[in-house]
């Protein structure tokens, strides 16, 4: 299951990448949709890159003993999570991983990046480059990224 915040057009992109279902979280009740798609069970893991707007609701998508992974905050910082809330929703786990923690040892970083490159090489991860900018337009690239005008991978081309 994948949620897309801006348009049905992104749903086509996500389906090409292997998603079975796409939910527009800003216009659909994504908790109800997740429960529907999972026959009321919920999911094992929620990966949330949005943060403030979706993190608490994401907890309601989880099965008991599920894991909430907040890795971004495009809508703002995630609100504080009360451990009692996690207990009441099924002994849930909550984490906010960062590359600075997981990539501190060279061997771990090489292992993790090697796994990603292997999945890219075997098409288990489908890379879509949807936007490219000249390096001289880096400020426009940042502005477009921050305003959510981009999706997928962005390539910066050296025009110097």
Regions inferred by a protein language model and the residue ranges of each:
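Single conserved hydrophobic/aromatic residue that forms the stacking wall/gate
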Residues: 1-14
